[in-house]
């Protein structure tokens, strides 16, 4: 379908070899077999994934006996040149296999970015003395083996950190970095995710302050209004609210206030740091011009952002003992 023919958000075009299954028996074009294609892209997930619903009348499932070696090539978009997703995925699961008729069946094929499979099969045990942004780049290039064109954006982080990645998967380590990194405004809002442009490591503040790439249309479609062609290209069927107000949950999870307790095993000193929601909130940019941070006084006439014992985070004793034993062995070796 050419660019000029696209007028509705429900329309799309499949480029040549747009939905191709690469198997040990060769390439199979699924353009005439798939009934539904769903691609999941979220800033809260490390990589892209999805499902494709197949109506199989040629016994493809029996011939292939899916074993994880299959790759799905997707080249699809609103037009041939706009909003195109061009990427290869790994088939990792088959489910919901149902007989439709005597000679036909339907099933779901689940796919995920190939880096996820590599991450599940790998681990990182390494000490770093660098910024979190440089650590992220090292993991992406040397452990997930990503070329530069697959790394879309890595935002610079503040400070040099000494950390040890403790024999965990690359995606676990990237999540570890995102939870601890801060930008130059000391905003702890880093996220690691993948979209159609590649892998990203940046802050919510930067995304909020950036100019919108497109506008989503929630209105009824195909109204025939003038100058409505652009709005029709990108639409949403519905909005799902995934998080709602829960005061008790916010208190116990340390949203309003908390206390960090750190133990230095070399000096045997204990350090405490109070963390206030108002303090952290001020470091980040926000979508609302008049943000509501939810400050109120409790029965003791104290602001909820000053109740630092609501949640305390501290190092577990078992890790301290383990690290102390490792330190003793290192001293003996010296």
What do the PLM-derived regions correspond to, one by one?
Residues 120-124, 211-214:
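Short, charged, solvent-exposed linker or helix-capping segments at domain edges/interfaces
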Residues 1-121:
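Assembly/oligomerization scaffold segments
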Residues 82-86, 146-151, 185-189:
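Short secondary-structure capping/junction motifs at helix and strand boundaries
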Residues 37-65, 224-334:
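An acidic/polar, Gly/Ser/Thr-rich interaction patch typically located in mid-to-C-terminal regions
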Residues 126-131:
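Alpha-helical support elements that line or immediately flank enzyme active sites
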Residues 119, 136-165:
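N-terminal export/assembly leaders
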Residues 106, 113-115, 152-247:
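Short beta-strand-centered interaction patches in the first periplasmic/extracellular domains
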Residues 133-137, 174:
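Extracytoplasmic/secreted envelope proteins and their assembly/folding machinery
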């Amino acid at each position: 379908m050419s660019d000029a023919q696209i007028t509705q958000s429900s329309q799309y075009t499949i480029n040549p070899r747009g939905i191709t299954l690469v198997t040990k028996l060769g390439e199979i074009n699924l353009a005439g077999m798939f009934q539904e294609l769903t691609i999941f892209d979220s800033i809260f997930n490390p990589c892209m994934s999805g499902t494709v619903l197949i109506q199989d009348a040629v016994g493809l499932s029996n011939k292939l006996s899916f074993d994880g070696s299959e790759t799905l090539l997707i080249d699809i978009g609103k037009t041939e040149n706009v909003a195109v997703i061009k990427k290869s995925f790994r088939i990792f699961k088959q489910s919901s296999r149902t007989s439709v008729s005597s000679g036909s069946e339907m099933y779901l094929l689940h796919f995920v970015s190939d880096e996820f499979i590599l991450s599940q099969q790998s681990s990182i045990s390494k000490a770093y003395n660098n910024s979190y942004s440089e650590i992220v780049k090292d993991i992406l290039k040397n452990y997930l083996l990503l070329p530069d064109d697959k790394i879309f954006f890595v935002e610079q982080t503040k400070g040099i950190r000494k950390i040890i990645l403790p024999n965990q998967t690359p995606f676990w380590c990237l999540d570890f970095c995102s939870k601890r990194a801060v930008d130059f405004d000391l905003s702890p809002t880093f996220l690691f995710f993948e979209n159609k442009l590649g892998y990203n490591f940046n802050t919510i503040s930067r995304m909020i302050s950036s100019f919108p790439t497109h506008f989503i249309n929630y209105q009824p479609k195909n109204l025939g209004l003038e100058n409505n062609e652009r709005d029709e290209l990108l639409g949403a069927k519905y909005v799902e609210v995934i998080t709602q107000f829960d005061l008790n949950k916010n208190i116990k999870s340390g949203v309003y206030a908390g206390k960090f307790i750190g133990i230095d095993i070399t000096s045997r000193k204990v350090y405490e740091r109070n963390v206030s929601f108002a303090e952290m909130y001020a470091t980040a940019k926000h979508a609302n011009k008049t943000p509501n941070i939810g400050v109120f006084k409790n029965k003791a006439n104290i602001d909820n952002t000053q109740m630092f014992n609501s949640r305390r985070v501290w190092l577990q004793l078992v890790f301290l003992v383990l690290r102390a034993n490792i330190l003793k062995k290192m001293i003996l070796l010296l």
